[in-house]
Amino acid sequence: MMYMVFLLSVAFVISFIGFSSKPSPIYGGLGLIVGGGVGCGIVMGLGGSFLGLMVFLVYLGGMLVVFGYTTAMATEEYPEAWGSNVVILSALFVGLLVEVAMIVWMIVDGEVGLISCGLKDMEDWVVLGGYGMDVVREDYAGGSALYTYGDWLVILAGWSLFVSIFIVIEITRGR
């Protein structure tokens, strides 16, 4: 199962490489939609079926509407593809080359170190499990851990959304 999650994570990174080197808004929306679907597949593969389904319904349902309106407003008669510009095509290939190099490095090295952020009392994160039946589901434990130990992350995410509202207002103010 972890090989499937690994392949999905490679597809996740490749979809965001395609998004970052987008030549036309249609392809950027396509990259984000594919990345959202693959990300939900990763969450489902790691045991969070409820969370993966909710993210799939909310994120992709809402974002498809937004992308539908934005591509209708910014549509072009002949949209520029990834291969029509040398700079965009080379940026796409450089991103794919870096991804392949990281995969080869992980396969050859065999281990990847994790960054420790110094959290104490990590035993609270352990899901209580028995023989084939868990007492607490992983996705619920992850949500409660986010609000318990990751309160700084929730505050940072809220502040980022608040600032992004003002950025969008400032960009669209003159129109």
UniProtKB/Swiss-Prot annotation:
Keywords per UniProt: Electron transport, Membrane, Mitochondrion, NAD, Respiratory chain, Translocase, Transmembrane, Transmembrane helix, Transport, Ubiquinone
Citing just one GO molecular function, the answer is: NADH dehydrogenase (ubiquinone) activity
| Broadest EC class assigned to this enzyme | translocase
* Catalytic activity of the protein: a ubiquinone + NADH + 5 H(+)(in) = a ubiquinol + NAD(+) + 4 H(+)(out)
The way this protein sits in the membrane is described as:
Multi-pass membrane protein
Q: Where found?
A: Mitochondrion membrane
**Which branch of life, at top level?**
Eukaryota
Q: What does the sequence similarity comment in the record state about its family?
A: Belongs to the complex I subunit 6 family.
Pfam families under this entry? Oxidored_q3 (PF00499)
Q: State the name under which the record lists this protein.
A: NADH-ubiquinone oxidoreductase chain 6
What does the UniProt record say this protein does?
Answer: Core subunit of the mitochondrial membrane respiratory chain NADH dehydrogenase (Complex I) that is believed to belong to the minimal assembly required for catalysis. Complex I functions in the transfer of electrons from NADH to the respiratory chain. The immediate electron acceptor for the enzyme is believed to be ubiquinone.
A cellular-component GO term for this protein:
mitochondrial membrane
Instruction: Give yes or no: UniProt keyword Repeat.
Output: no
Membrane-traversing stretches: 1-21, 26-46, 47-67, 87-107, 152-172
- Which Gene3D superfamilies does this entry report, sorted A to Z? NADH-ubiquinone/plastoquinone oxidoreductase chain 6, subunit NuoJ
Return the EC number.
7.1.1.2
